[in-house]
């Protein structure tokens, strides 16, 4: 079989600070008013009163969605979305394009390595540049799958289970339980600047949900980098009587010694997890060495599917789980092939968590949602990632090459 070459790469954005607000899509923080994801949630900025109530107040949604499309010389296209917005468009169109165009559609690892090395001097340890690179990598996998007529999970070696089971992240674990999810992860609302009173309030929330959900439904806390070791340790022990399954991302990404100490001091049986905002393979190797229980890379932020597969191997070698941060189809096709991913995350993007809404709505067409907390592998059997780009969205292409 003679495979085509890549003829064009294009980058659009939607939403963010230079477009319409509340566009949703790949930047799932870019939601409208009265949404749980922008309510009073603890963040590293919560210590400043003017930025405590709303995450959008400090600019969590300024980037917007990046859309990368790659076109082969036979006319077939692949695409992906992530969070990088207009700045990501510049990086793709003015820098990364030279490593993509003219390559065979199967040259994914070569392109990935060239992009990584070419951006080392300004990429740092992740962030915007890595989000952009990840989006390109995912678009390449989508194109390759569509060219050969196979879903991405089969390109990775095939499924190791018949279905993916999910826990739900959102403000209402009790509603997630009614929908058939195996657990519910809530955001914390208070942090070290609130002292013991903050701990008592978050513990009261956990206790209330435990009473509503019964003794066996999983409950977890997402702390979103907002704590220090002492506060996180006190919170974990205060929640232990309510059978908290894990405490997540208590510390900023680079505080590896802090994660090691938190794991050492955590209550017996309670897992410590992190990784959503780590952005390189090397950072995940170091994170793994802290002994945490679950690593949680975001496939749209960590280097793409190519890097996610490598992260899963690091975790597997140490007997750790890898449960990616919710990334819809981009993580579905990966985790169904990982033996150390027994469940996955579904992010509730409906404002009140009362209905199931596709995570990247409205940018993806055909994006599946769990049924009774599960997605069967047959749902993933379309070529590539199995979704199409909604070109009715307000897509802007600010740069061309």
Swiss-Prot record:
The lineage of its organism: Bacteria, Pseudomonadati, Pseudomonadota, Gammaproteobacteria, Enterobacterales. This is L-rhamnonate dehydratase. CDD domains: MR_like_2 (cd03327). It holds the Pfam family MR_MLE_N. Belongs to the mandelate racemase/muconate lactonizing enzyme family. RhamD subfamily. Binds 1 Mg(2+) ion per subunit. Mg(2+) binds at residues 222, 248, 276. NCBIfam families: PRK15440.1. Disulfide bonds: none annotated. GO terms for molecular function: L-rhamnonate dehydratase activity; magnesium ion binding. Its EC number is 4.2.1.90. Gene3D superfamilies: Enolase-like C-terminal domain, Enolase-like, N-terminal domain. The gene is rhmD. It comes from the Bacteria. Its cofactor is Mg(2+). Reaction proceeds via a syn dehydration. Catalyzes the dehydration of L-rhamnonate to 2-keto-3-deoxy-L-rhamnonate (KDR). The record marks 298 as: Increases basicity of active site His.
